[in-house]
Amino acid sequence: MTEQQTNGATDANAPQFSLQRIYVRDLSFEAPKSPQIFRQQWEPSVSLDLNTRQKALEGDFHEVVLTLSVTVKNGDEVAFIAEVQQAGIFLIANLDAASMSHTLGAFCPNILFPYARETLDSLVTRGSFPALMLSPVNFDALYAQEMQRMQEAGEVPTVQ
């Protein structure tokens, strides 16, 4: 009986991670040169900006938002601009500060990316443009680069 109570206490302090919800927080699409752009030779150049942010909610819940912004030019003209903010609510408990920072900064965005990529691709094809085939992103490497940049700048990472 004592063993069971001890195990129960240990389990209560064990790290917890659970995805609660995935949703589109914001979505936009602009094709400023349509319909003329559809009659031109298609020679696109793609620019992708990626950003993540997180916010502590009540209790052990956290919102993580992954933003993908794509600008595609055909020659010198902007063919389209598309942006998606893919968000998730995660239950994360009993992690040390470094593990919490890594989970929010790399692990959660890695979960959100396939949803954001599919939403962005669907948005672009509905605008009558060729599908975007975004390559997978190594969020662990991006997180490590950001931690190194912060360390060199003397900044302290914070979990909000």
Swiss-Prot record:
GO terms for cellular component: cytoplasm. GO terms for molecular function: unfolded protein binding. It comes from the Bacteria. HAMAP family: SecB. Its main location: cytoplasm. This is Protein-export protein SecB. The gene is secB. Pfam families: SecB. It comes from Pseudomonas entomophila (strain L48).
